[in-house]
Swiss-Prot record:
One of its GO terms (molecular function) is arginine-tRNA ligase activity. It is found in: Cytoplasm. Pfam families: Arg_tRNA_synt_N, DALR_1, tRNA-synt_1d. It is an enzyme of class 6 (ligase). Its EC number is 6.1.1.19. InterPro entries: aa-tRNA-synth_I_CS, Arg-tRNA-ligase, Arg-tRNA-synth_N, Arg-tRNA-synth_N_sf, ArgRS_core, DALR_anticod-bd, Rossmann-like_a/b/a_fold, tRNAsynth_Ia_anticodon-bd. This is Arginine--tRNA ligase.
Amino acid sequence: MNIQAFLSEKISMAMSAAGAPADSEPLVRQSAKVQFGDYQANGVMGAAKKMGIPPRQLAEKILEHLDITDIADKVEIAGPGFINIFLSPVWVAQQAEFALADEHLNITKVTPETIVIDYSSPNVAKQMHVGHLRSTIIGDASARTLSFLGHNVIRANHLGDWGTQFGMLIAYLEKKQNENAADMALADLEEFYREAKKCYDEDEVFAERARNYVVRLQGGDEYCRTMWRKLVDITMQQNQLTYQRLNVTLTEDDIMGESLYNPMLPGIVADLKAKGLAVESEGATVVFLDEYKNKEGEPMGVIIQKKDGGYLYTTTDIACAKYRHEQLHANRVLYYIDSRQHQHLMQAWTIVRKAGYIPDSMSLEHHMFGMMLGKDGRPFKTRSGGTVRLTDLLDEAHERALTLIREKNPDMDEEELNNIARVVGIGAVKYADLSKNRTTDYIFDWDLMLSFEGNTAPYMQYAYTRVASIFKRADIDESALTQPISLTQPHEKQLALRLVQFDETITQVAREGTPHVMCAYLYDLAQSFSGFYENCPILSAEDDNVRQSRLKLARLTARTLKQGLETLGIETVDRM
């Protein structure tokens, strides 16, 4: 149950009955301090100001119309007009029981929407590097979260699989095949791309053949498409291994590359011209947007077709949004693309809406993110200044975690050691990113992310194993816990309340695409459990009813931690 939404609705009705303006927001929040109750409504001041009356006077009127005696022990007015709500321990215990009995932790059922999530988007014939990490893992956390809530999620891997460079790559692939060197791993493709560029720059005969292949590929030539497909397949087979290592849910079926939209581009340019939105300007086709001004204060021109007939990323993005409405019937489209692309996307979407390609009800959202920086505050690079390949980063994460786990468990079996190191190492890299507000840059620091203290993956994974181990030591089946949850101690209520706040947390993450909110919640939950564990004996509780109640809270904690980490794509292990 979403307590915040429930209280917001109740207080909103009471505000209306008290004569507050129709647009008044109750502004219900979880209280920061226990003396202010469990929840606080902060919207009275704003409403009272509009009405021209003292906030406390309005607050008193609201309380006359507020009926939440079945869920709250006490409701009080504090300060100038805050409404503090103290929830009943009996009611909180009941909500915890409902969560424990439900495989989805009693999450509020949603009206399913079709949500397209555009993320990862590597390029063909290039290895994935650290620049792809944020889009890939933040986008995947969003996909997992929305799927868990019951939405129809369509993952869209917008692969860079089209463009003039493919003439050069096809010509070089042909050359390599003639030299019997056709079987390439993606590691060779990095060198392959450089060698192809070298041939293109230095050999005019090769360059002419490459230009010819571009024309043939765009015209649908079967030979060129076969060679192009081979380049795409080699790339994606290797990328798929990286996705599996990262525990990312993307598959080859999720590829919706630039080539998918290419057949739509001539029609879109013609249509924008026919609608009077696009005009010829210095040989190119341009859309002038009043919403964006250049340095001279004139409408900014957005090129959709170059003088030589070539199309731009903007044209593809216009086609992409149109396709996602017409073919995928999307209600929402979430783009996990870095913040530097914001204006480009906004311009493309402005054209899309002006052209009437999507309905007003369809939401296009740029869930932008900042950069990953080294300890020096500069973009994360190798020591020699090169781009860090994602496979190298994940290898190092595994090695560092292996050293750490081996030190703590010198007698552990090698296979188990490697599995735990894999889960901890990859989890550490992902969690370090996901736990930061995605809109900001963040510092990549091995020591911090692999620490067993603080808001890190190792701490969270250890917290889960610690809670799960209680049940093993109890040697009791969950079905044998027949006594109800009872909250008589402050730490019991604090833990139970935090557990049932999972609903409102995941709702916020789904709405805003902010996995750091889930990380903060899980860290706080783990700390609440620590306080509960230290102050409320579980297995040594003298009263069996109390013992069963506390075991139930421990079980719900383990399930909530595991489910929360799963929405982030972070694995857990049974022991560390």
